[in-house]
């Protein structure tokens, strides 16, 4: 099957959406499908305001239309609500062909945190974007329910996975040269240093040991100045990041707006338990068993979650991560695709 994947988030960007799409493409190609990714690197771009490292396509509609005409795909999936997403949406509507979309990021929460834009405005815009979609893929049941309550339709559950080979299990936290001889326990945060990540909830925790942060973002300079005792590592290659996960005693997800939170799965695959708030992504990833989280701890008080997660055996974190696989996620994705005009081919071209 020929699939056109249109996305504003792609390499060399570093974020969970890019990771998800790269893994998806790899799995689809391994099944024999032909995937054509249309991304900002194929167009003239401009930096995204306030988000260094993210470039957005400009004046792309004509070229994008030509690409899709030339590809003649069996299915079109629009992964993001950026400029390329809107252009692909317009193309499909004009051609009267069906397409699917995905909801990866709570942009209304980001705009609200950074610029105080009312949440209702942001969700009205996204509801309009996804309205003509034949299937809106969402990563968790919590997000699905939230979008349903906000008037989104044609919602489809699409979970994610983790590379269990890359993020290898370690029974005990390892020693990593980037971390030196740090006071234990080592608490790790991985993510963009931006408003919506709520990172200061992590940095302000009164905990023993050392805090380590991997990531860059618009708040980076001010945070480094205000929290000099934190070990700041910047962005790391994924193979290096896997080793840092393995060296941590626990992982802290301070964000309250994660739709999924792949970084949690990556940490847990290495055996590092997670402390997080009981919100959409963490509730899905950590799950609940008799009221207790699996592979970590959830609590409205992040400090309480931190202490509880520290007591979680590393093998329990690994076991929970194994529930999620990219193979399963890819099967779900294929089930949710819709043909542009007629019946989809059953297998690869």
Q: What is each of the regions a protein language model found here?
A:
Residues 273-276:
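Short hydrophobic beta-strand element within catalytic cores of glycosyltransferases
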């Amino acid at each position: 099957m020929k699939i056109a994947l249109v996305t504003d988030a792609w390499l060399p960007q570093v974020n969970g959406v890019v990771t998800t799409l790269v893994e998806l493409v790899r799995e689809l190609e391994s099944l024999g499908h032909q995937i054509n990714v249309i991304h900002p690197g194929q167009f003239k771009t401009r930096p995204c305001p306030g988000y260094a490292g993210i470039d957005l396509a400009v004046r792309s509609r004509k070229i994008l239309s030509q690409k899709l005409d030339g590809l003649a795909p069996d299915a079109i999936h629009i992964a993001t609500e950026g400029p390329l997403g809107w252009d692909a949406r317009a193309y499909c509507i004009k051609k009267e062909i069906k397409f699917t979309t995905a909801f990866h990021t709570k942009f209304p929460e980001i705009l609200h945190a950074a610029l105080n834009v009312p949440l209702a405005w942001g969700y009205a815009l996204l509801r309009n974007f996804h309205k003509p979609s034949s299937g809106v893929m969402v990563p968790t049941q919590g997000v699905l329910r939230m979008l349903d309550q906000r008037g989104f339709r044609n919602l489809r559950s699409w979970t994610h996975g983790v590379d269990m080979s890359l993020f290898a299990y370690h029974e005990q936290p390892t020693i990593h040269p980037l971390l030196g001889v740090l006071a234990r326990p080592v608490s790790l945060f991985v993510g963009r240093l931006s408003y919506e990540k709520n990172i200061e909830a992590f940095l302000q925790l009164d905990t023993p040991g050392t805090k380590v942060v991997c990531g860059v973002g618009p708040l980076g300079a001010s945070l480094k100045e205000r929290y000099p005792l934190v070990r700041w590592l910047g962005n790391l290659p994924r193979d290096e990041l896997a080793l840092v996960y393995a060296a941590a005693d626990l992982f802290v997800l301070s964000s309250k707006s994660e739709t999924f939170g792949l970084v949690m799965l990556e940490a847990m695959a290495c055996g590092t338990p997670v402390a997080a708030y009981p919100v959409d992504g963490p509730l899905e990833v950590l799950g609940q068993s008799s009221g207790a989280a699996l592979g970590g701890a959830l609590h409205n008080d992040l400090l309480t979650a931190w202490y509880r997660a520290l007591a979680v055996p590393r093998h329990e974190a690994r076991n929970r991560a194994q529930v999620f696989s990219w193979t399963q996620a890819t099967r779900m994705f294929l089930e949710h695709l819709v043909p542009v005009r007629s019946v989809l081919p059953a297998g690869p071209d």
